[in-house]
């Protein structure tokens, strides 16, 4: 990617609006990704975002795993964690580049598995950036990256494509149970 390029994806309309405001105040290239399909709309809730800072959405003291993801999956996973009392931490990596090294290092020091859940290609994506950061900081943490392999993906509805790739939320939760 371009030097000093910022890549971000909000979890809902408020975050996307805040990212737009932030992008206009920057001098470096700034890409805001948006999902195919719909996104949660919440016009009555303003939010602030700081460049390169992630959001700790769910912080469970008794967590078995930390899930790092971004986009509209954050809201869906948060609802599942809260509704089903799942012992998971959830981090919204709304900045895919640059990553929040400070928060990432603190998560890695919990000595719990980290699952990076993306809807994008694995090579060169968020998971690779996370591994690079942990390596740079000499942290050996169990990191699992769930994303799209280096393949051609058939077209279809978002849900059908995710199911065919094993990237639907049920597959995520089954994977987490298999490693914990």
What are these regions (language model features)?
Residues 1, 24-180:
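Thiamine diphosphate
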Residues 3-10, 162:
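Flexible, glycine/proline-enriched loop segments at strand-loop-helix junctions
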Residues 9-24:
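Conserved glycine-bearing catalytic or ligand-binding loops at nucleotide- and phosphate-handling centers
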